[in-house]
Amino acid sequence: MNILALDLGTSSVRGLVLDGDIQPVPGALARRRIDLTVDDDGTGTLDARGYLACLFDCLDELSEQGWLREVELVAISAQWHSVLPLGADGQPLGPVLTWLDTRPEPSPTQAGPADPDAFHQRTGTWWHRCYWSVRLPWLRAHCGTPVTRFAGLVEYALSQLLDDAPMSTSQASGTGLLDLCVLDWDPEACALAGVTGGELPELAPPDWRGRLRPAYARRWPTLARARWAPPIGDGAASNVGSGCIDHTRAAVTVGTSSAVRLLQRMPANVPLAPLPPQLWRYRVDHDHVVTGAAYSSGGNLFAWADRVLRLPDGPALEAALWELAPDDRRPANIAFGGDRPPGHRRAGSGELGGLSFGTTAVELLAGLMYGVCEQVVDDLEALESTVRAPVEVILGGGAMAASPWWRAAFAGVLAPRQVRFGRHPEIGATGAALVACGRVADAVALADIGQTDDQSSAGTA
């Protein structure tokens, strides 16, 4: 049995085929880049119909090349926190708000949760612009057209493709409206959002499986009999794909953005363990949660620096970074895109310090990259407090794969913990497939975890 793994991210849509051993089939990959609208006013949106077209293009490409012939299951890793308003016909009334969008703010006349700590413990989130409790009223006020209901981007896309497209437990937890214990919409969170149950997606039961609508079964006949598994949040998928599936290992992932996360078994309808005040908690599925912190900055800082600072190319840049002494980096506030919850800094809050006429582009880059490392430390300590022991750290993500120097910098900052590098290139797809197959326990064997690079040149010594 082959598995089609879809990665519905913010910057790209990807589809790849995995074999029965959850290994990528060579060559069976299609990818389309997504055009985001990002502005200094905090805008971070994308076009839902354009996104759907990119997904269709990926499926067309894989189908035309014969890669879908033996696919029996579709697994999905999807961005958390996106939302768009829909009309009575189920079509978008405006663009999709992604996690990047920092514009939504509560009404000055609206009070927040009656007991903020209890709200945080129950939903794993805060009354914050990243979550639907703040986003939905803001969307209503700015839409200009009456909104019939709201959906995440993945629910909208699947509603066009499948005969049925309820919201998975994992995706629902990212809205901030879900009670993580009872796995139903939280009444207080819904009241803050100004919605009733009928304006929200239906929640998927644990055994839900979808199938293509007849028109798309004819378009992709080799997928006609495939079962579609509930989507899981991309962060949860990355943890599983990294082999970080229990309380002994934390995943630090740096892609476009960055995050530190710990996965734990916490079945539904069982009281949840206490949650530290600065951390969020979302669902992987009905049996597991992922706890952690996420940051707006990661590989996007490198992309900005590469575009603006005229950096050396490839190997020359890596060599220049290794040649720096620890004091050569420049201090940086890396909140270029603002804060993710629970912080409230807006986009445009980044700063560079310690500049002189002798400061080099490589020194500026090193300061930015160290800033990404250092933001993880306090939140990792908070995660460790929930398990009362130091954890092993597994680095992963595209930005980590691209820079041995950055991996070594992380190892130095996070010492004396053991820090290793997950070399598997498809951690999100692999994680989603493992969850869909009920094989989370196999994740460690598949993760291909190796040692980090020499720490001495990029560490804190």
Which role does the model predict for each range below?
Residues 32-37, 97-105, 172-173, 256-258, ...:
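Short, acidic/turn-prone active-site loops that include or flank metal/cofactor-
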